Regions:
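Short N-terminal signal/transit or membrane-insertion segments
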Residues: 22-34, 183, 256-269
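Alpha/beta enzyme core
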Residues: 4-16, 28-55, 62-79, 89-204, ...
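A short N-terminal beta->alpha junction/helix N-cap motif
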Residues: 1, 18-26, 58-59, 268, ...
């Protein structure tokens, strides 16, 4: 099936009452793991990477093109519908480069801005992306971040959400409704009433960030209230590190190191980390209801 528009993937999810995960990758192995899981589960995929927890000098030197190019090539070869997302870019210039390198969906990290500034910046992104055939996600409201003692949250106001979407023509709206960035363990309390109120007045699919902290029992009720996409990342990195550490500990003394680094075989310690991510993402696709929808 290959490259697909994110807005089409999310429209189908919203209509069907399920969520599609954006599983945030950071390199070749994690990108491949996400696509392998999608093909195994026959789930639509949103492949991509983010700028929020990635070194900015590296991204600005060549990282945007490197990761966007990898994700695009995988999407083109996919047997399921696959979009390519640059998530939470720090600048409009990064978005410009991401679009040129193959991303067909973008999001500017603008939720910290005052409403008027966020509105103006989002309009600039839409003016870049839509003529290039790319979709735009924006976040309105502000999530807490578990890395910084929670911080302050600003829940999304339904009336503001409606006006913002109408004024910007974005394709997806990330909302603050109880989820928390970088929280593990499914302890977030999702405000389902707020989701219902927003979905009733907003024409585009809703998105929840902070997926690692969303309890499993809240996922399908959120999907029934307009949420079509969940962003997920924290536990993927933990799974990768656990698989890598376990594999590295088992490398025999005096072994041919080529068998364990870069071989792309089952012995390769990086492939072992990739397998852990694939297993985790596959299970989440089942939980989100997207398995079997491609």
């Amino acid at each position: 099936m290959g490259v697909a528009r994110m807005r089409d993937i999310l429209a189908a999810a919203r209509k069907g009452g399920y969520c599609v995960g954006y599983f945030e990758a950071w390199d070749q192995y994690s990108l491949e793991a996400c696509l392998e899981a999608a093909e195994l589960m026959r789930s639509p995929a949103i492949l991509g990477f983010g700028a929020a927890v990635t070194d900015q000098p590296w991204l600005d030197r060549w990282g945007v093109e490197e990761l966007a190019g990898l994700a695009r090539r995988l999407a083109e070869a996919a047997t399921v519908p696959a979009a390519v997302l640059f998530n939470e870019a720090r600048t409009v210039e990064q978005i410009r480069r991401g679009l040129a390198a193959g991303c067909n969906a973008v999001m500017l990290d603008s939720s910290h801005m005052p409403y008027a500034e966020n509105l103006a910046a989002t309009r600039d992104v839409v003016a870049l992306a839509h003529p290039a055939g790319a979709d735009v996600e924006v976040e309105l409201g502000h999530l807490k971040d578990a890395r910084f003692d929670g911080g302050e949250a600003a829940m999304t106001d339904p009336a503001e959400a409606r006006a913002f979407v109408e004024d910007t023509r974005v394709d997806a709206l990330a909302v603050a409704a109880g989820s928390v960035h970088s929280m593990a363990g499914g302890a977030a309390k999702i405000d389902l009433e707020r989701l219902s109120a927003i979905s009733a007045v907003v024409r585009v699919p809703l998105v929840l960030h902070g997926g690692s902290g969303i309890p499993p029992e809240a996922i399908l009720p959120a999907a029934a209230r307009g949420v079509a996409k969940i962003n997920y990342g924290l536990r993927m990195k933990r799974a990768f590190l656990e698989g890598l550490a376990e594999a590295a500990a088992g490398v025999p003394t005096g072994a041919d190191i080529h068998d364990y680094i870069g071989a792309k075989t089952a012995r390769d310690v990086m492939v072992r980390g990739q397998a852990r991510v694939r297993e985790l993402v596959s299970g989440l696709m089942r939980a989100y209801g997207s398995a079997g929808k491609a």
